[in-house]
From Swiss-Prot:
Protein name: 6,7-dimethyl-8-ribityllumazine synthase
GO molecular function: 6,7-dimethyl-8-ribityllumazine synthase activity
Subunit-level organization: Homopentamer.
Organism: Mycobacteroides abscessus (strain ATCC 19977 / DSM 44196 / CCUG 20993 / CIP 104536 / JCM 13569 / NCTC 13031 / TMC 1543 / L948) (Mycobacterium abscessus)
GO cellular component, one term: riboflavin synthase complex
Gene: ribH
Biological function: Catalyzes the formation of 6,7-dimethyl-8-ribityllumazine by condensation of 5-amino-6-(D-ribitylamino)uracil with 3,4-dihydroxy-2-butanone 4-phosphate. This is the penultimate step in the biosynthesis of riboflavin.
Positions annotated to bind 5-amino-6-(D-ribitylamino)uracil: 26, 58-60, 80-82, 113
PANTHER family: 6,7-DIMETHYL-8-RIBITYLLUMAZINE SYNTHASE (PTHR21058:SF0), 6,7-DIMETHYL-8-RIBITYLLUMAZINE SYNTHASE DMRL SYNTHASE LUMAZINE SYNTHASE (PTHR21058)
EC number: 2.5.1.78
Binding site for (2S)-2-hydroxy-3-oxobutyl phosphate: 85-86, 127
One BP annotation, GO: riboflavin biosynthetic process
Gene3D superfamilies named among the record's database cross-references: Lumazine/riboflavin synthase (3.40.50.960)
Residues at the active site: 88
Pathway given in the UniProt record: Cofactor biosynthesis; riboflavin biosynthesis; riboflavin from 2-hydroxy-3-oxobutyl phosphate and 5-amino-6-(D-ribitylamino)uracil: step 1/2
Amino acid sequence: MSGDGIPSLSVGDASGISLAIVASTWHDQICTALLEGAQRVATEAGIDRPTVVRVLGAIEIPVVAQALARTHDAVVALGVVIQGETPHFGYVCDAVTTGLTRVSLDTSTPVANGVLTVNNEQQAIDRAGLPGSAEDKGAQAAAAALDTALTLRRLRQPWA
């Protein structure tokens, strides 16, 4: 795990940003921890009530993220895909990653990919922001989405 080089998660005042979070319920303890990390960063940035939508699995995340990206300034996608014994893992990971990237580019809305793609459950726990976890990918994804939304807002302002 590369925890080296993690930037500050403080994004400053994002109170004018509308944030949505879509999180799967598969591996619920881990996904709920990711969601809590994202919500904590949102609160620290001045967003008291981000829109939260729960979906069953990771493969459902991109289409819901697309709907949310049409009505929000930033979207955070959270979930867990754990390697199994079949090629299904690769298909799901590719579909989710490609789907989220496409949504972000097609809508010009930041969609932060906080979907963990790991070899085993312990790797997911280590990244979920649970007690004893080395990282909090939910918090990191929220910070990335908010920071990018603020950057895009500045870039879109007419030059005086």
